[in-house]
Structures are given as C-alpha cells and as structure tokens.
Curated annotation (Swiss-Prot):
Its main location: cytoplasm. Keywords: Acetylation, Cell projection, Coiled coil, Cytoplasm, Cytoskeleton, Glycoprotein, Intermediate filament, Phosphoprotein. Residues 261-282 are annotated as: Coil 2A. Residues 100-131 are annotated as: Coil 1A. Neurofilaments usually contain three intermediate filament proteins: NEFL, NEFM, and NEFH which are involved in the maintenance of neuronal caliber. May additionally cooperate with other neuronal intermediate filament proteins to form neuronal filamentous networks. Transmembrane segments: none annotated. Residues 30-54, 590-601, 624-637, 728-743 have a biased composition (Low complexity). Residues 96-407 form the IF rod domain. There are a number of repeats of the tripeptide K-S-P, NFM is phosphorylated on a number of the serines in this motif. It is thought that phosphorylation of NFM results in the formation of interfilament cross bridges that are important in the maintenance of axonal caliber. This is Neurofilament medium polypeptide. SMART domains: Filament. Residues 525-541, 556-572, 602-623, 651-664, 675-727, 744-771 have a biased composition (Basic and acidic residues).
Length: 858
C-alpha cells in the first residue's frame, strides 16, 4: 500500500484514507473481531465524514469569512446608524446580535466538528501505525520466506543432483543387470548343456545297467547249468559208485573216486571263478573304454555345441539388429509413403489449382484476344477513315495545284473510264474492310498487324533492290530515249497494220487466252495447295467462301468497269487514231474501227501476257527490270511489254490470288485490279507462296519492273523523253482497254453519250486520282510504308503513270502528258489509276496473306 504525505487536515487525504480504511476493513481477514467491528464503525463514520467533507468541508471557512465580512459591514452600518439615528442603532444592534448568535452557533458547530475530526485523525493515525507495523511484519515475513526459498532452492538443487546421481546409478545398475542377464543366459545355456549331457549319461547308465542285467542273467543261467551238470555228475557218480559197490573192490575205488571228484570240482570251481573274473574284468574294461569314448565325444560335442551356441547367439544378435533395422526401415518407408501420399495430394491440389488458373488465364487471354481484335478492327476502321481523309486531302491539293492545267488538258472524256475503274476498287476496299470485320478469329487480326510490320521491312528491302535496278535502267532509258520516239511512230504504224491481223486472230487469241487462264488457274491451285498444306480445314472453307464472295464482287466490279471502259474507249477510239488516220467519223464507223482495234489488241494482249509470264520468271531468277528494257527497243512490243509489267504482271499475281482470272484477260488492264483488293483475304493462298519460294511472284508484280524504271528514268531523263515513253505505254494501254471495252461495243453503243461529257469525265478523273492516292496511302498507312518508300511505291504505281507523269516529276505529271497526246494520254491515265490500284491491292494482299499464313501455323 502506498501512503501519500499530504497533511492530515487535507480533505482529500481524509477521503482517501477513509475509503481505504473502509475497503481494508471490509476485505481484511484479521483474527480480531473487535478490530473488524471497529473498522466497520469507522467505515460508517468515514462515510458520514466523507459526505460531510464533500459537501460542507469548505463551508466553515467561507462562512467564517462571510461572518467576518458581515461583521465589518455591520460595524460600518452601526457607525452609520449612530449617525442616522437611534432607531437604526436598535435595529442594527438587534441584527448584530442575531448575526453574532448565528455566528456563535456556527463557531460552536465548527469547534465540535474540529474535535470530531481531530479524534478521527487520531484514530486514522493509530490505524496507520498498525498498518505500518503489519507492513513491517510482512517485510520480515518476506525475508524469512526468501531465506526459506533459498534453502528450498538449495535443497532442490541437491535433490536434482541426487536425482542425477541416482539416474547415473540406475543406468549403471541397468548395465549391471544387463550383464547379469547375459551371464544368467550363459549359465542357463550351460545348465541346459549339462542337463543334456547328464541325460545322455543317464541313458548310457541305463544301457549299462541293462547290459549288466543281461550279464547277470547269463551268470545265473550258467550257474543253473553248473548246478544241473553238477547234479547229473553226482547222479552219474552215484551210479558208478553203485556199480563199483557191486564189485569187490568197491571201497578202494570209492575213495579214489571221491578224491577225484573233489579235485575235479575244485578245478571246475577254480575255472568258473577264473572265467567269471575274466568276464567281469573284460566287462569293466569294455565299460571303461566305452565311457572314455563317450566322454571324449561329449567334450568334442561340447566344443561344437559351444561354438554353435556362440554362432547362434551371434546370429540372434544380428537378427535382432536386422529386425531393428527392418523396423526402422519400415518406419522410414511408412513415413516416406505418407510423405509421398501427402506430396501427391499437394501435387494434385496444385495441379487442380494450376489448371484452374490456366483455364482462367486462357479465358482472360481469349477475352484479351477478342478485345485486341476488336481494337484492331476499330484501329483498321480508323486507319481506313484516315487513309480516305488523307487521300482526299492529297487529291484536293493536287486538284488545287493542277486545276488550270486539268481544265485545259482533260476537258475530254479521259477520266470517265478511270472513275469507273476506280469506283469498283473503292467498293472492293470497303468489302475488304467488311471481311476484316467479319473474320471472327482474333489471332488472325493480331498476326495480321505483326505481319504488316514484317512486310514493311520486306517491301523496303525490295524497294531498295528495285532502286538499285532502276538506277541501272535509268541510264539505259536515257540512252534509248531517242530510239523510243522512233519506236512510238513505228508502234503506231504497226498498230494500224496489226488491227487487220488482229481481227482474224481474235478468235485464236480468245482460245489461247482461255488456255492461259486455265494454266494460270492450275498454277494458282498448285500454289494454294502448297500454301494450304499447313492450314486448317476451317480456313480452307473460309477461303472458299471469301473467294466466292470476291468472285461475285469482282464480277460486279468488272461488269461496271467494262461498261465504263467501253463507253470511254468508244469515245476515245476516234481521237486515238485521229492523228494518224483521220478526225472522228460517224459513230458507226467509229464502232467498226473499235472492233478492229479490239481484235488487234486481243493478239497484243496474248503477246503481252506471254511476255509478262516470261518477265515474271526472269524477275524471280534475276532482276525484274531486264525484261522491260528489251521491250522498249521494239516499237510495238516495247509498248506492250511495258503493259505486262504494269497490268499483266499485276494480273498474274491476281491470277495467283483469285480464281476469277478467266474473265481477266479481256479486262487485263483495270477491272481485275479493283477486284484484287477483295482478294487480299481470299488470296490467303498466295500468302503461303510469298513465304515459301514463290512469294517473289506477288512481290515482283507489286514492284512491276517497268513501273519503277519509269520512276528512275523520270528523275535523270528529261520530261520530253518521259512523255514519249508515256505515249508508248498509253498507246498500249489504250489498245488493251479498247480490247476489253470494244468487245462489248455493240451492247454499249448507246452509253457513249454519257461518258462523252467532259465534266463528268473530269470529275471521274479527279475521283480516280483521289482513289488511287487513297489506295496507295492506305497501303502505306497499314504499317507497310510510311516513309518516302511509300512515295516510291506510289511512283511505282504511277511510273506507268509516272512515264506519263515524269514530265513534271511532281504531282500533276499526268496533265502534261495529256497535253502532248490527248487520247493516248487519257488511256495512260487509265493505266495510272489501274496501276495504283494494283500496287495498293498487292501490298494489302501481302499483308493479309502473311496474316493468313500465321493463322494457319497457329
């Protein structure tokens, strides 16, 4: 208990002490009942005093102070009252008396309270002294207890020491007991051995006793025989004596005989005794020998038994140790089996958890793939929108830059067929986008994006190679620029001559074209088989469905393109031949001429296709540019071979990419090119050939050797030479387009007026240029070419344009060419639009084909 050092008069101290005393008195277990009663009385008094202290302890001082103040005030009042009057003095005195009486009463009460509190303080001091004595007694008891605890701890240590000693003794005793047990076991074994030997000896003694009994019986029988023989002998002797007595000399004989019998009996007795002694001696010797042999055998057996017992004991110890080891091994085996079972359970649980996590991750991966595909589709849509906007912006820029030249130069009907051809390409691009959206697998979209990046590098490498080849070809083109002018004139003359021949060969050309188309289809099938070997059946079904859809769309686009091409070419045919032949004639004559030109162009198309195939093969083996240069040497063939690199080479990849090429030969120039963008996803078959050995074919057509050649020659060569080359190409293109369009001249003769309108054609020209730029930029924005490499790709597309465009070397090159040669330049513009479509669609096809190949592998 802790006691505060506050003064005893402090009310807080009193309150605390009274409360502690009350609690202590209630909780105390002291033996004095009087103390208990006193504490209870104190507790009651303390409660009263505490309540009084809490309430009225501070009252005396305040009351006393108030009385003092009141007395002072009363004195003041009395003084004032003396001044004021006697009445007031009386009242004041009476008031003072009352106040003094009250103060006296209060003072008496305070004095009583003080006495009571002093008495209570004395009691508290006495109780405190008692408590201090108790506390001192407890401290002494604590010391005593500590001493006892020390003693007990020492005793405990001693006991623990004794216990350890006893444990050691017990261990030693156990060891002694173990040794005694071993000795006891040894003694027991020795006892058993001795008992066994004793039993054996007893058996031998029994056997000896039996033998002795037999010998006794024999002795008895011999004695009986001796007695019998003795009796017989006596009888015989008696008979003899009787016979002797019958004679005279009986007495003497009897004496003699008697002496003889006694001696004989003595001798016989001596012999029998000797014989019995001899037999006894022999029996003893035999028994001794037998006993010695048995003892020797017993000793030997004892040693053997002892060694055997030692071996048995050793074996027992080994057996015991082995049994202990076996038990330990069994325990370890059981523990290992339990551990193994636990591990298997944990492993199974882990497997289940891992499988669950794998399923969850697969589901999440599937969801992320779907989301990625959705984002990619959205990205593709945005890219397409961006491409369209970029193309429109570029087209508007070109239109603004070359607006005056175009209005002056292209007032004719040049751009009508271009617009018609461009329009299907735009529709095809839209259908292609729809196909991308339709494709459900998201892996395909992902890998498409990756393959676009890979194709980027490939296209850049190819373009770098093409630039090297173009640099060499540019020099050749510069040297042959003068020859090209003469060749153009010769080409025009030969074109006129070939028109007559082409009419006859039109039928043969159609048959040959059909054969070539069939061969191309076979090649496509072979390539598609090689590409589809690693693909799944689902992809083949999807490719077939896409191919059918692409064929239908291409058929529609080709129909529209043929109609537009026929209209435009019908309008163009008279001016195309206006410089060499005559001004435009009546529509009937123009149609007849167009038919002739179509026949001539059919033969040229066949030649161009053959040249294109050869050029494609040569491009695969070596550089793609070589077949184009020799074609430039000849007047008409150079022009036509320039076509094969652009339209026909572009068509050959389309043949490889889609089965629709039976219709392509007539529409070699444009209709299939717009249709090709639909094929980029059906052409998944060519995708594989691009990755195997054959992929160079689609690449070479995309980089048509001639188109890039015009690009490079345009840079080094003058614009006039470029214009001449463009004129040759435009003539060939016009022939091809005329072949396609004039086949349907009879059906579409009425539609010439619609295409003849210069304004409509100009609008179509602008739209086609925009679409061509859109396709080129679309291919670029797909991730393949965003740098000047894309501009080169556009030039490659434009090269055939560029041969027309190179004169300016900038954006509006086509307008200058059209100024030089109106009709042919218009046809060249057709080629430009077509070539742009070819390049763009080919690039897109590469991207899609790569994506399809990765899908098949996965």
């Amino acid at each position: 208990m802790s006691y505060t050092m506050e003064p005893l008069g402090n009310p807080s101290y009193r309150r605390v002490m009274t409360e502690t005393r009350a609690t202590y008195s209630r909780a105390s277990a002291s033996p004095s009942s009087g103390f208990r009663s006193q504490s209870w009385s104190r507790g009651s008094g303390s409660t009263v005093s505490s309540s009084y202290k809490r309430t009225n302890l501070g009252a005396p001082r305040t009351a006393y102070g108030s009385t003092v103040l009141s007395s002072a005030e009363s004195l003041d009042v009395s003084q004032s009252s003396l001044l004021n009057g006697a009445a007031e003095l009386k009242l004041s005195r009476s008031n003072e008396k009352e106040q003094l009486q009250g103060l006296n009463d209060r003072f008496a009460g305070y004095i009583e309270k003080v006495h009571y509190l002093e008495q209570q303080n004395k009691e508290i001091e006495a109780e405190l002294a008692a408590l201090r004595q108790k506390h001192a007694g407890r401290a002494q008891l604590g010391d005593a207890y500590e001493q006892e605890l020390r003693e007990l701890r020492g005793a405990l240590e001693q006991v623990s020491h004794e216990k350890a000693q006893i444990q050691l003794d017990s261990e030693h005793i156990e060891e002694d007991i173990q040794r005694l047990r071993e000795r006891f076991e040894d003694e027991a074994r020795l006892r058993d051995e001795t008992e066994a030997t004793i039993a054996a000896l007893r058996k031998e003694m029994e056997e000896a006793s039996l033998m002795r009994a037999e010998l006794d019986k024999k002795v008895q029988s011999l004695q009986d025989e001796v007695a019998f023989l003795r009796g017989n002998h006596e009888e015989e002797v008696a008979e003899l004596l009787a016979q002797l007595q019958a004679s005279h000399a009986t007495v003497e004989r009897k004496d003699y005989l008697k002496t003889d019998l006694t001696t004989a009996l003595k001798e016989i007795r001596a012999q029998l005794e000797c014989q019995s002694d001899h037999n006894m001696h022999q029996a003893e010797e035999w028994f001794k020998c037998r006993y010695a042999k048995l003892t020797e055998a017993a000793e030997q057996n004892k040693e053997a038994i002892r060694s055997a017992k030692e071996e048995i004991a050793e074996y027992r110890r080994q057996l015991q140790s082995k049994s202990i080891e076996l038990e330990s091994v069994r325990g370890t085996k059981e523990s290992l089996e339990r551990q193994l079972s636990d591990i298997e359970e944990r492993h199974n649980n882990d497997l289940t958890t891992y499988q669950d996590t794998i399923h969850q991750l697969e589901n999440e991966l599937r969801g992320t793939k779907w989301e990625m595909a959705r984002h990619l589709r959205e990205y593709q849509d945005l890219l397409n929108v961006k491409m369209a906007l970029d193309i429109e912006i570029a087209a508007y820029r070109k239109l603004l830059e070359g607006e005056e030249t175009r209005f002056s130069a292209f007032s004719g009907s040049i751009t009508g067929p271009i617009f018609t051809h461009r329009q299907p390409s735009v529709t095809i691009a839209s259908t292609k986008i729809q196909k991308t959206k339709i494709e459900p697998p998201k892996l395909k979209v992902q890998h498409k994006f990756v393959e676009e990046i890979i194709e980027e590098t490939k296209v850049e490498d190819e373009k770098s190679e093409m630039e090297d080849a173009l640099s060499a070809i540019a020099e050749e083109m510069a040297a042959k620029a003068q020859e090209e002018e003469q060749e153009e004139e010769k080409a025009e003359e030969e074109a006129v001559e070939e028109e007559a021949v082409s009419e006859k060969a039109a039928e043969q050309a159609a048959e040959e074209e059909e054969k070539e188309e069939e061969e191309a289809e076979e090649e496509e099938a072979a390539k598609s088989d090689a590409a589809e070997e690693g693909g799944s059946k689902k992809e083949e079904i999807e490719e077939k469905e896409e191919g059918e859809e692409a064929e239908e769309e291409e058929a529609e686009a080709k129909g529209k393109a043929e109609e537009a091409g026929a209209k435009v070419e019908k309008v163009k045919s008279p001016p195309a031949k206006s410089p060499p032949k005559s001004p435009p004639k009546s529509p009937v004559t123009e149609q007849a001429k167009a038919v002739q030109k179509a026949a001539a162009e059919v033969g040229k198309d066949q030649k161009a296709e053959k040249a294109a195939e050869k050029a494609a093969k040569e491009e695969k083996a070596a550089s793609p540019e070589k077949p184009a240069t020799p074609k430039v040497t000849s007047p008409e063939k150079p022009a036509t071979p320039e076509k094969p690199p652009t339209p026909e080479k572009a068509i050959t990849p389309e043949k490889v990419r889609s089965p629709e090429k039976p219709t392509t030969p007539e529409k070699v120039v444009s209709p299939e090119k717009p249709a090709s963008p639909e094929k980029p996803r059906t052409p998944e078959k060519p995708a594989s050939p691009e990755k195997p050995a054959t992929p160079e074919k689609p690449r070479t057509p995309e980089k048509p050797a001639t188109p890039e050649k015009p690009r490079s020659p345009e840079k080094p060569s003058s614009p006039l030479k470029d214009e001449k080359a463009v004129v040759e190409e435009s003539i060939t293109v016009t022939k091809v387009t005329k072949v396609t369009a004039e086949v349907e001249v009879s059906k579409e003769a009425r539609k010439e007026d619609i295409a003849v309108n210069g304004e409509v054609e100009e609008k179509k020209d602008e739209a086609k240029e925009k679409e061509a730029e859109e396709e080129e930029k679309g291919v670029v924005t797909n991730g393949l070419d965003v740098s000047p490499v894309d501009e080169k790709g556009e030039k490659v597309v434009v090269t055939k344009k560029a041969e027309k465009i190179t004169s300016e070397g900038g954006d509006s090159t086509t307008t200058y060419i059209t100024k030089s040669v109106t009709v042919t330049q218009k046809v060249e513009e057709h080629e430009e639009s077509f070539e742009e479509k070819l390049v763009s669609t080919k690039k897109v096809e590469k991207v899609t084909s790569h994506a399809v190949v990765k899908e098949i592998k996965e």
